[in-house]
A protein has these predicted regions:
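C-terminal peripheral helix-coil segments that are non-catalytic and often amphipathic
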Residues: 131-135, 153, 169-215
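Alpha-helical structural segments
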Residues: 7-18, 22, 36, 53-73, ...
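Short, hydrophobic secondary-structure boundary micro-motifs
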Residues: 28-29, 102-105
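Amphipathic alpha-helical packing segments from all-alpha helical-bundle domains
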Residues: 109-142, 150-165
Length: 215
């Protein structure tokens, strides 16, 4: 992607984030996005097939960047602290984009839900943690290669989907939302083999501004 394309992408990202905070993407047209972003419709289609796809890709990019920041070098030694810090970063992202996620995760939403995107992103993140050897599988010595693959993939989907469900419940709590309380709850819900830090002080330190979601 060249510099001009990156500038266009940035304008599209700002536009869809603004519009999606107001109403579902099913009510947003490509023409409206293009007009606000100062581009034509054909340029829009070079970046996404539909408004919902554009929003999902923008949010997924932000979440993936946070994951890389906190988990790119995760190992078995630092997994609890790194995973907890990544969880806090995801919570802050969701809190910053609360208007968007409230619309995109609403029970009465018809189509264009953000839940599948979140499930995909977090499942991919968990699989990468497994691939780095940062998690010790229970009874690993008794598992065949096929059983290990089944456990790993099942565990990734299980942890990701459960975390997304918990994020959604937390999003419904009144602002200012309590991250520490969420960590206490999710710590009780996660399986015992999942690395998670019980002392949350360092993870709750103010976020580096460079890692925060951009408007």
């Amino acid at each position: 992607m060249d510099a001009r394309q990156r500038r266009t992408r940035a304008r599209l990202a700002r536009t869809i984030l603004q519009l999606a905070a107001e109403r579902p993407t099913s009510e947003i047209s490509v023409s409206e996005i293009a007009a606000r972003a100062g581009i034509n419709r054909s340029t829009f289609y070079q970046h996404a097939a539909a408004p919902c796809e554009l929003l999902e890709s923008v949010l997924a990019e932000e979440l993936t960047e946070l994951s890389m920041t906190h988990l790119a070098t995760v190992s078995a030694d630092d997994a609890p602290a790194a995973i907890t810090s990544a969880t806090v970063a995801a919570l802050r992202h969701i809190d910053e984009r609360a208007d968007i996620y409230r619309v995109g995760l609403g029970d009465d939403l018809i189509g264009a839900s953000l839940q599948p995107m979140l499930n995909r992103v977090f499942t991919s993140t968990v699989l990468e943690i497994f691939e780095r050897g940062a998690i010790t599988l229970p009874h690993a010595e008794c598992l065949s290669e096929e059983q290990r693959e089944l456990f790993t993939r099942s565990a990734a989907h299980f942890v990701a989907a459960g975390s997304v469900a918990a994020f959604r419940v937390w999003l419904d709590t009144p602002a200012p939302r309590d991250i520490a309380s969420f960590l206490e709850v999710i710590g009780e819900l996660l399986p015992s083999w999942w690395p998670f830090q019980t002392e949350h002080g360092p993870a709750l330190a103010p976020a580096d501004e460079s890692t925060l979601a951009r408007p």
